[in-house]
Amino acid sequence: MADLSKYRNIGIFAHVDAGKTTTTERILKLTGKIHRLGEVHDGASTMDFMDQEAERGITIQSAATTCFWKDHRFNVIDTPGHVDFTVEVYRSLKVLDGGIGVFCGSGGVEPQSETNWRYANESEVSRLIFVNKLDRMGADFFRVVEQVKKVLGANPLVMTLPIGREDEFVGVVDVLTRQAFVWDDSGLPENYEIKEIPADMVDQVEEYREMMIESAVEQDDELMMAYMEGEEPSIEQIKACIRKGTRDLAFFPTYCGSAFKNKGMQLVLDAVVDYLPSPTEVEPQPLTNPETGEPTGEVATVSVDAPLKALAFKIMDDRFGALTFIRIYSGRLKKGDTVLNSATGKTERIGRMVEMHANDRNELEAAQAGDIIAVVGMKNVQTGHTLCDPKHECTLEPMIFPEPVISIAVKPKDKNGSEKMGIAIGKMVAEDPSFQVETDEDSGETILKGMGELHLDIKVDILKRTYGVELEVGAPQVAYRETITKAVEDSYTHKKQSGGSGQFGKIDYRIKPGEPNSGFTFKSTVVGGNVPKEFWPAVEKGFEGMMQNGVLAGFPTLDVEVELFDGGFHAVDSSAIAFEIAAKGAFRQSMPKAGPQLLEPIMKVDVFTPEDHVGDVIGDLNRRRGMIKNQEMGATGVRVKADVPLSEMFGYIGTLRTMTSGRGQFSMEFSHYSACPSNVAEQVIAEVKERNAKK
């Protein structure tokens, strides 16, 4: 049985182009998992195994790989850096115990780095920092360290210092051991020598070593007192303090190097062993009540002897069949075991289990707490489902995914492609919870919903290449919403007599704007039995059912509070269905009186531009109804942060590249809903009516 203290479940995350996938490749090379190094530049990278990833040079799915370093087992997950795929980062962070944040030595803290860092903070994941690409023109390790402090509000603990700059970067100094690691120009990671620290760096190394020890001993009162009295702790004592501080997120051990040139990577791997936590050292996953989603107060203790508790965190369909990636928190799992899916109440037999290496695999007979593995051919499991021992039912804390903000209508070019498309989309929805599909009841069109243009582009591409479904794609549509601005007190009676028993339900109610992000809330203050209590849920159901189709343009309605305060019933003719119909009629009657208003999604946009184009970029964002929030001067350009309506951002990447001669970058994520200006609202409503008229 494997020793859990020697497990490290880690993720590698960063901004697009910070060198994340290359860093992972180097880890695999150094740990003996691959023999020829794949480069993202030439589309041969091991972790980027989808066609779309190899072509675009970005990582879309989180590939999981197992490798070994100094008798420790690493389960490594390479996460995407593009903002449209942050759901993959979020999903990975859910099952990781530690991570490596990769930053570009010249680009520094870029927009997506911030988003991923925030997610990792929320998940309380311990991290190392690796400042990569120090061989690049304009790379500056110390500037990036300052940016980490200023932009991320984090505390980087410098563990290595660079020897040389840009194309003269030859190696690193280990601040703790006072050793210089110098590589030759062969590009081979093993071709290095350990030397004396260069004379011109001795003072700098001592300065950083003192700062490092001061930060470390703050984790141990006795050591701190001894250090203040002039007694230097041993290297092992310092390491123990750094390990504790890293685990508690007090600081982030920070390394430097060049993954592409194979310089500095061994020290990062040693740091994973020395400072990142094992599965037994992180807060155990909370168990929740499946009905309410509230924590029960119990946890999934990380132990091989406890009953099985595992989380399905990713579904993937590949050339070998359907794969369900699971993180085992407690217990053991063997081939042939029967497990309970607590979300469906159904049991499944475990057939084949595999350990993944990007998209290759090793067959397993058994797995245990701490393992991240894939199970082949599970039937009814979705992302976020808990798999457990049938005799010890439990539910792990579920995953919550962001709502899609953009949609496109699609239909197969070939009339016979509908069934094929339906099967393919079904598989893709199971794989990616932020990708949703629905059918327009009036037009029969299939509507695909996602997190951004690139997200949906790639889905259409996968349908074409992987499943052979050619699509006609409509223009992107924005996920507008509706709300109300005024309170209304009203009454509605539903009455139907047609021989025999009829239908009767009378409700007196108030509708008013709810708190932001409250969705729909309902309460009854009826006294005296004018509307019997058993009919209150029917009234609530009637109102809530109508919230999906607002009165302005049929968009879902947000933040509405309904109070039922009186009404009337008939001893024979009243029923739950009569009161539900009354509530639906009341919605149609009163919502137009309540000042209905169209809401549009506002995106948090983060643009990086060379300084000489900043005026053009800001002018363009203003024309897009953007509100500029912040401007920051960096070493290589300017970062502009703005809130911009999603409807104004379609095709923005092309405009930005043209304005900045191809040097601009941007990321955006959903921020909030805001009232549409009246001229925009009128145009949107008119377009919806025109579209509906054609159906």
Swiss-Prot record:
Primary location group: cytoplasm
Residue stretches making up the tr-type G domain: 5-280
Molecular functions (GO terms): GTP binding; GTPase activity; guanosine tetraphosphate binding; translation elongation factor activity
Protein name: Elongation factor G 2
Listed InterPro entries: EFG_II, EFG_III, EFG_III/V, EFG_IV, EFG_V, EFG_V-like, EFTu-like_2, G_TR_CS
Task performed by this protein: Catalyzes the GTP-dependent ribosomal translocation step during translation elongation. During this step, the ribosome changes from the pre-translocational (PRE) to the post-translocational (POST) state as the newly formed A-site-bound peptidyl-tRNA and P-site-bound deacylated tRNA move to the P and E sites, respectively. Catalyzes the coordinated movement of the two tRNA molecules, the mRNA and conformational changes in the ribosome.
Pfam families named in the record: EFG_C, EFG_III, EFG_IV, GTP_EFTU, GTP_EFTU_D2
Transmembrane segments: none
Keywords carried by this UniProt record: Cytoplasm, Elongation factor, GTP-binding, Nucleotide-binding, Protein biosynthesis
Positions of GTP binding: 14-21, 78-82, 132-135
Signal peptide: none
Keyword GTP-binding attached: yes
Compartments, record wording: Cytoplasm
HAMAP family linked: EF_G_EF_2_B
Similarity comment text for this entry: Belongs to the TRAFAC class translation factor GTPase superfamily. Classic translation factor GTPase family. EF-G/EF-2 subfamily.
GO annotation, biological process: ribosome disassembly
Gene Ontology cellular component list: cytoplasm
Coiled coil: none
Listed SUPFAM superfamilies: EF-G C-terminal domain-like, P-loop containing nucleoside triphosphate hydrolases, Ribosomal protein S5 domain 2-like, Translation proteins
